[in-house]
Amino acid sequence: MLVVGESLVDVVHRASGERVEYAGGSAANVAVALARLGRPVRFATAFADDHHGSMVRDYLEAAGVRLACDPAAIDRTATAAATIGADGAASYEFDLDWRLLPVEREPAPVAVHTCSLGAVLAPGAEDVLTLLEELRGAATVTYDVNARPAITGTGPDVVARVERVARLADLVRASDEDLEALWPELDLAEAVAHLRGLGAAVVVVTRGADGASWTSAQGEVVVASRRVEVADTIGAGDTFGAALVDALAERGLLGGRLGPIGDDVVVEVLEHAARAAAITVSRPGADPPWRHEMA
C-alpha cells in the first residue's frame, strides 16, 4: 500500500480546558491505521526536523510505517489546533505548508490512497496528481475527500481540485458534511451521482450516527453506525477509510480498477470499517485499532 499526503500534530484544546498534543494528519492516520491492521505500508509525506516532526516520526515508526520519500521538504512541521466540543466533535485551525519530494515507485503498490489537504493544497497537490496518474490502472486508487474549509475554503477552485482527484479514483469516500460543503446546490443522492459521473466506480458516504452507504453501478448498500461512548472524533474518518482499504485487500479486490462487488461482501467491508472507526472515537486523539482489537 502507498499512502500520500499530510502529516501534522494535533494541538487539542478540550472543553475542560486541558491542552494535549497528538501526532496525526489525515494521511498519516490512514497510513498508521493500515499498518496497525497488518498491511505493509509506505507513506509519502512531509515533516520537518523539529519537535513536532519527531512526534510524527515516532507515531509512524511505532506502527511500522515506512517512508516512501525524504520528508524534509518543509521548514516547520504542520500543526492543527483542534477544539473539542462537549459532544466530542472537533473543529480545526491549521498551520500547514504542503510539499513533496520525489517518491519511490518500487515496490509497486496494489493500492494508492490520498486524502484531505494533501490532495488539494498547492504546491504538493500537483505532485500527488502526477503520482496518481502514473500509478492508476496497475494500482487501485482510493480518495478520501475529508474537506477542510477552514484552510482551503469551498470556492469553485477548491471544488475543481477535488473533482480533479476524484476523476482518477476508483473509490471515493466523503462525509455527508463534505458533500454539503462542496456541492451545496445538490442533495446527497445528487452529489453521489455527480462523483460517480466523474469516474469513480464506488462512492462511500459516512453519515455519522446515521451509518454509511456504498453506491456503485450495482446500486446502494447502507449499514448502521456502531453505538459507542465518544471521547472525540479525531481520526474517525481516516480510520474508516483505512479499514475500507484493508477489507478490500483481505478479499483480494485491490490491484487495478474495482469491478462489481456483491452486496454481501459490501456489507462486510462497511461493517469492518464502521467497527474500526468506532474503536477510534472511543479513545482520545487519532488512535486507530490494532488488528487484534478487531476480533
Predicted regions and their residues:
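Conserved phosphate-binding/catalytic region of the ribokinase-like
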Residues: E134, P184-A295
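Positively charged, low-complexity intrinsically disordered leader regions
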Residues: M1-A15
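Active-site metal-binding loops of divalent metal-dependent hydrolases
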Residues: S7, V145, T239
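Alpha-helix C-terminal capping segments
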Residues: A31-P40, A247-A249
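Conserved N-terminal subdomain of the carbohydrate kinase-like
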Residues: V11, R39-L121, V141
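Conserved beta-alpha-beta core of the PfkB/ribokinase-like small-molecule kinase fold
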Residues: A111-A193, D210-G211
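Structural alpha-helical scaffold elements that stabilize or flank donor/cofactor-binding regions
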Residues: E104-E106, R164-V165, R196
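Short catalytic helix/loop segments, enriched in acidic residues and glycine
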Residues: G17-L34
